[in-house]
C-alpha cells in the first residue's frame, strides 16, 4: 500500500453569468478546436522530473558551472507502441540573452543529446546526472539486452558505455573515476528455483513489474577506465527503487548507500514511528539477518562503503527516516576535508547517555554529520516529525522540501514549507568543528543563481517551462512541450469542496464538459486516488495513466469529479473503507443537489487502494452507480490474502486490519465487502495489469459472473500498475471512455475494431435487464 501524500488547496471563487431565462454556455467549446481524445493524451510530450542533489524534484538539471541545462521528455508513439524519451540540452548563455532581450520569440534552441524508445519504464532514460561541465551520465536500454550506464559529451555527442552488466543496471553513481552501481542479483532463466521469499508476482513473471519494484540486488564498483567490476561486500539484498541511491565521495575512497535493516538492537523499538503497530522497529518485525526477506522492504539504514577494498558496514546504529513519513528528502553531502559525511532523513543512535537527548532523538529523524574514522555523530538540526495532530490532519506539518550544501562556505541551507505558507529557510554554518544556525544567510544559495527554470501549470493552465533571470527580474517561456495543444478543447476545472456524513472535509477538482450549459444535468464520472490543485488534469492525478481519462471524458460530454484523499478518512483500519465510501457518496450527492449531475447517470473509476473503498460504496449504496471500473484494484479478499503470504508482516497486518481482523479463512466471507455484492445491478469493469493482479482480480470476477451479474474483465499481461505502453493506455483509458459512454450515454463508437467489445457489452446489458426483473420480483 502506497504512502499517503495529501495535497491541500486554496478555494477559488467562481463567477457565474446568466442571461435572462435562456440556457447559457458558461465554458464554451471553440468551434475551431478539435475534441481531445485518449490518443491525443498518449501523444502529449511530458517533461519528466529529476532528483536533484538537494533532494527536490526539478524539471531541469544545470551543469555544475550552470552553463548548460538538460531536460528529459517523454511522448507516446502509438504506432510503434513505445514511449520516446529524449534528453534535450539548452545553452544557459542563450537563455540569458533571451531573457535580457525585448523579444519573446523564438525561444532558445534545444539540442537533442539522445533519444530512447522504451517498451517498459526500466528501459528508458533515468538516473541523469552531470559528471562534469561537459559530460552527462544516465542509464538506458540502448544497444544491449539490459539497461546500462552511459556518459555522453555535450559538445561532440560521443557516447561512452560505463557498465557491461549481464543482468541490467538498476541505478548508479559516478565520481572521482569510480562507477558504483546496483544490478539485479541474477539474470532470468528457466531453471527450477526455490520460491524462498519471492512474491507471487516475481515467481510467475520474473522480468515484470514485481521484480523491478523491490528486487534482489547486488552492488558493484569499477573505474571509468575500463577496470573489471568488483562486487561490494554486501549480501544479496532486497532493496526497492526508493533505496537504490548511491553517493560517492569526491576523493573516490568512500560511498554512501542504503542497506536493508535485517536486524537491529533492542533500543530501536524506542523510535516513535507513526502507526507503530504496523511500521515500528519491534522485535517481531526483525528479519533475523536475512537481507532478502520481504520484512526489510521499507526498513533500511545508511551504509558506508570503502571503495578501496569493497568493505561495507552500517554508517549508524539507527534506521533511516523513511518510516517516519515526514517527507524529508534523503540527501548526502561530503565536506571538503573528506573526513566526514552529512546525511539527512536518518534517526540517530540512542547511546548518548543523556535521557533528554535520547528522548529527542526518539521523536524523529535528523540531519547529522558523521566522522568517518571514529563514527562520532554531530546533530546539525532535528527534522519535523509526525504528531497525533498532524497525523489526523487537524494540524499542518512543516516539512523539509530541500537541503542545499555549499562546500566552500561550509553552509547547509534547509528549506521548509507548511500548508498555505511561503517557504522558510534556515542556514547552518560549521565553524571550528561546531555547527550553529546563522540567520540571514539562508538566501545566499538562491542569490548566486543568475537563471532558474521551473515548471508552471494550474487547474486550467497546461504545463510549460519558464526561465527567470535574477538581474533582470524577468520571466519568459522557455519550452512549451505541446504547442499543438492549442488546437484542442479542454474542459474547464474548478476546486470543489464538500463535507460528508461523518463531518469529514473533502476536496477535489470538478471538470466541466466542453460546451457546458448552466441548468443542464450531465452524466458524471468520478475519478479517485487523489487531487492536486496546481495540476492541469489530463488523465488522472499525478499523471496516472491507468483507467483515468479526465479530459477525454470531459470532451465526451461528462462532468468529471476528481476526488482528493482525506487524512480523516484514511484510518488504516476497518473504518477506512466505510469512511471513504461516505466521502465519495457525499461528493456525488452534492453535485446532484446542485443540479449539475444526472442522478441516473453516475459512474466511478477506482484504482489501487480506492478499489477497496469502492466495494464499500457498492455495498452501502447499491443503486448509486450506473457503471463502475475497478482498475488494478486492491480488492482485499481471501485470494489476495493468500497471494500475499510472502509480503512483509506490516503489509499483511494492514491487509487484515482494514477488514477488522482475520483469524481464519472464513472471516473473509463475513467481513469483506467483496462477498456481499452478489446482488448488485451496477455493471462492473475489472482491469488487471499483471499476472498476480489477474489472479487476485479473478476472485471478484468469478463471484459476479457466477451470480450472473454484468461484469467485464480486461487483462493487460505485460502491464504496469501505472500503465506505461501506449497500447495498454489506449486499452485502459480509451476502454473506460467507451465503457461509460455505453452505459451512461447509450453511445457506441462506430469504429469496426470495437465491434466485439460492444457485442460483449450488449449481452451484459441484456443480462442486467433480466437481473433487474428477477431481483425486483423477489
Identify the meaning behind each predicted range:
Residues 12-24:
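Bacterial N-terminal signal peptides
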Residues 277, 528-529, 688:
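The conserved beta1-alpha1 loop
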Residues 58-61, 68, 73, 254-259, ...:
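Non-catalytic accessory segments flanking enzyme active sites
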Residues 541, 546-556, 560-778:
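Active-site-proximal cap/loop segments of hydrolase catalytic domains
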Residues 520-530:
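Short beta-strand element of the alpha/beta-hydrolase
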Residues 1-10:
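N-terminal secretory signal peptides that target proteins for export/translocation
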Amino acid at each position: 500500500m502506497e504512502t499517503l501524500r495529501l495535497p491541500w488547496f486554496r478555494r477559488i471563487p467562481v463567477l457565474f453569468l446568466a442571461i435572462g431565462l435562456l440556457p447559457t454556455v458558461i465554458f464554451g467549446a471553440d468551434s475551431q478546436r478539435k475534441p481531445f481524445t485518449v490518443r491525443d493524451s498518449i501523444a502529449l510530450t511530458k517533461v519528466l522530473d529529476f532528483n536533484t542533489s538537494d533532494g527536490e524534484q526539478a524539471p531541469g538539471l544545470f551543469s555544475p558551472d550552470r552553463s548548460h541545462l538538460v531536460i528529459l521528455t517523454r511522448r507516446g508513439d502509438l504506432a510503434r507502441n513505445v514511449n520516446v524519451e529524449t534528453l534535450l540540452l539548452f545553452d544557459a548563455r542563450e537563455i540569458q540573452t533571451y531573457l535580457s532581450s525585448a523579444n519573446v520569440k523564438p525561444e532558445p534552441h534545444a539540442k537533442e543529446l539522445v533519444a530512447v524508445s522504451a517498451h517498459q519504464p526500466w528501459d528508458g532514460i533515468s538516473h541523469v546526472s552531470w559528471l562534469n561541465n561537459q559530460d552527462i551520465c544516465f542509464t538506458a536500454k540502448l544497444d544491449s539486452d539490459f539497461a546500462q550506464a552511459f556518459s555522453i559529451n555535450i559538445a561532440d555527442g560521443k557516447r561512452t558505455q560505463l557498465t557491461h552488466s549481464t543482468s541490467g543496471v538498476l541505478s548508479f553513481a559516478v565520481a572521482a573515476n569510480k562507477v558504483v552501481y546496483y544490478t539485479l542479483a541474477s539474470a532470468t532463466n528457466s531453471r527450477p528455483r526455490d520460491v524462498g521469499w519471492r512474491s507471487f508476482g516475481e515467481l510467475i513473471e520474473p522480468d515484470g513489474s514485481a521484480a523491478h519494484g523491490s528486487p534482489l540486488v547486488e552492488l558493484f564498483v569499477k573505474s571509468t577506465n575500463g577496470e573489471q567490476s568488483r562486487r561490494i561486500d554486501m549480501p544479496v539484498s532486497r532493496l526497492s527503487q526508493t533505496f537504490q541511491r548511491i553517493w560517492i565521495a569526491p576523493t573516490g575512497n568512500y560511498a554512501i548507500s542504503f542497506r536493508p535493516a535485517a536486524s537491529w538492537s533492542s533500543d530501536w523499538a524506542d523510535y516513535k514511528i507513526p502507526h507503530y503497530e504496523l511500521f515500528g522497529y519491534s522485535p517481531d518485525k526483525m528479519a533475523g539477518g536475512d537481507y532478502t526477506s520481504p520484512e526489510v522492504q521499507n526498513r533500511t539504514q545508511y551504509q558506508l562503503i570503502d571503495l578501496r577494498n569493497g568493505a561495507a558496514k552500517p554508517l549508524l546504529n539507527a534506521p533511516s527516516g523513511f518510516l517516519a513519513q515526514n517527507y524529508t528528502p534523503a540527501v548526502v553531502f561530503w565536506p571538503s576535508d573528506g573526513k566526514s559525511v552529512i546525511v539527512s532523513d536518518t534517526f540517530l543512535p540512542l547511546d548518548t547517555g543523556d535521557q533528554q537527548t535520547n528522548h529527542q532523538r526518539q521523536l524523529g529523524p535528523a540531519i547529522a554529520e558523521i566522522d568517518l574514522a571514529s563514527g562520532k555523530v554531530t546533530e546539525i538540526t532535528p527534522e519535523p516529525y509526525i504528531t497525533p495532530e498532524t497525523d489526523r490532519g487537524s494540524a499542518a506539518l512543516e516539512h523539509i522540501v530541500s537541503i542545499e550544501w555549499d562546500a566552500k562556505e561550509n553552509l547547509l541551507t534547509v528549506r521548509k514549507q507548511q500548508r498555505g505558507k511561503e517557504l522558510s529557510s534556515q542556514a547552518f554554518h560549521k565553524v571550528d568543528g561546531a555547527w550553529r544556525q546563522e540567520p540571514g544567510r539562508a538566501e545566499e544559495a538562491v542569490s548566486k543563481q543568475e537563471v532558474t527554470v521551473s515548471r508552471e501549470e494550474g487547474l486550467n493552465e497546461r504545463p510549460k517551462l519558464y526561465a527567470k533571470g535574477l538581474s533582470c527580474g524577468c520571466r519568459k517561456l522557455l519550452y512549451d512541450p505541446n504547442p499543438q495543444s492549442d488546437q484542442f478543447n479542454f474542459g474547464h476545472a474548478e476546486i470543489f469542496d464538500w463535507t460528508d456524513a461523518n463531518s469529514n472535509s473533502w476536496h477535489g477538482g470538478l471538470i466541466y464538459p466542453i460546451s457546458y450549459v448552466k441548468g443542464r444535468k450531465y452524466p458524471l464520472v468520478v475519478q479517485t486516488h487523489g487531487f492536486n490543485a496546481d495540476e492541469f488534469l489530463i488523465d488522472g492525478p499525478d499523471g496516472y495513466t491507468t483507467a483515468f481519462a479526465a479530459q477525454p471524458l470531459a470532451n465526451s460530454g461528462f462532468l468529471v469529479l476528481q476526488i482528493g484523499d482525506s487524512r480523516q478518512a484514511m484510518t488504516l483500519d476497518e473504518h477506512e473503507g466505510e469512511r471513504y465510501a461516505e466521502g465519495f457518496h457525499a461528493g456525488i450527492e452534492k453535485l446532484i443537489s446542485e443540479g449539475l449531475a444526472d442522478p441516473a447517470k453516475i459512474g466511478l473509476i477506482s484504482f489501487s487502494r480506492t478499489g477497496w473503498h469502492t466495494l464499500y460504496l457498492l455495498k452501502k449504496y447499491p443503486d448509486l452507480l450506473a457503471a463502475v471500473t475497478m482498475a488494478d484494484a486492491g480488492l482485499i479478499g481471501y485470494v489476495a490474502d493468500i497471494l500475499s503470504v510472502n509480503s512483509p508482516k506490516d503489509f499483511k497486518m494492514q491487509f487484515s486490519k482494514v477488514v477488522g481482523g482475520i483469524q481464519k479463512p472464513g472471516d473473509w466471507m463475513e467481513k469483506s465487502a467483496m462477498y456481499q455484492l452478489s446482488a448488485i445491478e451496477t455493471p462492473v469493469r475489472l482491469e488487471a495489469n499483471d499476472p498476480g493482479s489477474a489472479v487476485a482480480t479473478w476472485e471478484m470476477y468469478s463471484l459476479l459472473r457466477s451470480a450472473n451479474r454484468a461484469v467485464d474483465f480486461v487483462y493487460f499481461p505485460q502491464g504496469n500498475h501505472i500503465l506505461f505502453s501506449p497500447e495498454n493506455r489506449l486499452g485502459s483509458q480509451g476502454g473506460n471512455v467507451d465503457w461509460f459512454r455505453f452505459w451512461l450515454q447509450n453511445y457506441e463508437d462506430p469504429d469496426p475494431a470495437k465491434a466485439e467489445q460492444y457485442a460483449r457489452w450488449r449481452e451484459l446489458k441484456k443480462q442486467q435487464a433480466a437481473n433487474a426483473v428477477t431481483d425486483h420480483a423477489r
